[in-house]
């Protein structure tokens, strides 16, 4: 039996899990800037876009974590994740890349579910309603 409290707790845990990979990813790219820029260039994306990628991942992850502007952040990160999947993991000859492709698609699905449900009571958005 689902209760509002259980739903809100599940949304909190979902936000924590979804945000972790983006906060860490943005942080790691900032601290290994040249390596990250090289990886982007190799994938056909200009390295000059790396600051935008870092901000999107790190700030977007923090927004999801605290649950502020959650719907906006969730739809933005869903789109970002799908674009990254197709630029960097669309290689069906490489099993590892295929796994990353489907992982990114699944993460985007999680963000779409978060977009549809909102952040829940245990969030900045939830405290404001």
Predicted regions and their residues:
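Flexible, solvent-exposed coil segments and beta strand-coil junctions
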Residues: 43-44
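Extended, low-polarity transmembrane helix blocks
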Residues: 1-31, 38, 47-55, 59, ...
